[in-house]
Amino acid sequence: MSQSGEENLQGSWVELHFSNGNGSSVPASVSIYNGDMEKILLDAQHESGRSSSKSSHCDSPPRSQTPQDTNRAEIDSHSFGEKNSTLSEEDYIERRREVESILKKNSDWIWDWSSRPENIPPKEFLFKHPKRTATLSMRNTSVMKKGGIFSADFLKVFLPSLLLSHLLAIGLGIYIGRRLTTSTSTF
């Protein structure tokens, strides 16, 4: 794009024109509101910007005048004088009521959203893992530290528990084996 083309844009708005077959072009941004809703929203944004700009964390540069804004201002100034020629008085009032009802319905969630507290995490937001003081290992027990597997303290606990677990396993095996042999012989 040439330098003069970029200077003509003066912002991020681009106006597109479509031809309707007979050679005349129609702007793509034709709305039934003719920018009234946008003007109301911009006014509300400017009013809220005055009160909240001091506490705003993100200061942005002021918005520059775009070609679409200047065209819209010219159209709006002509539309007030030509209001009776394009629309009847009743249609104009009905359209204004529709716009106001839409703005009332949509403004509640905007107000709730904009007045909520900021989600700012604390400055010292570090995860601290708990230190393991005692691991579940036989090597770290006091019995193993004293004399190992063949110490008297370890053998006093380990051998009776080993013997008891084997006796329970043998007894359970014999009991289940007898139940199975008696149940198969009755069939």
Swiss-Prot record:
Mitochondrion listed as a keyword: yes
UniProt main location, coarse: mitochondrion
Cell compartment(s), UniProt: Mitochondrion; Mitochondrion outer membrane
Keyword terms of this UniProt record: Apoptosis, Membrane, Mitochondrion, Mitochondrion outer membrane, Phosphoprotein, Transmembrane, Transmembrane helix
Composition bias, Low complexity: 50-63
Role of this protein: Apoptosis-inducing protein that can overcome BCL2 suppression. May play a role in repartitioning calcium between the two major intracellular calcium stores in association with BCL2. Involved in mitochondrial quality control via its interaction with SPATA18/MIEAP: in response to mitochondrial damage, participates in mitochondrial protein catabolic process (also named MALM) leading to the degradation of damaged proteins inside mitochondria.
GO BP term, pick one: positive regulation of release of cytochrome c from mitochondria
Origin superkingdom: Eukaryota
Motif range (BH3): 93-118
Family membership noted in the UniProt record: Belongs to the NIP3 family.
Residue ranges with Basic and acidic residues bias: 71-81
Gene source species: Mus musculus (Mouse)
Subunit details: Homodimer. Binds to BCL2. Interacts with BNIP3L and ACAA2. Interacts (via BH3 domain) with SPATA18 (via coiled-coil domains). Interacts with BOK; promotes BOK oligomerization. Interacts with PPTC7; this interaction promotes BNIP3 degradation.
Coiled coil (UniProt feature): none
PANTHER family for this protein: BCL2_ADENOVIRUS E1B 19 KDA PROTEIN-INTERACTING PROTEIN 3 (PTHR15186:SF4), RE48077P (PTHR15186)
Pfam families in the record: BNIP3
Record's keyword annotation contains Transmembrane: yes
Membrane topology recorded in Swiss-Prot or TrEMBL: Single-pass membrane protein
Descriptive protein name: BCL2/adenovirus E1B 19 kDa protein-interacting protein 3
Chain spans, region Disordered: 42-86
GO molecular function: endoplasmic reticulum-autophagosome adaptor activity; GTPase binding; identical protein binding; mitochondrion autophagosome adaptor activity; protein homodimerization activity
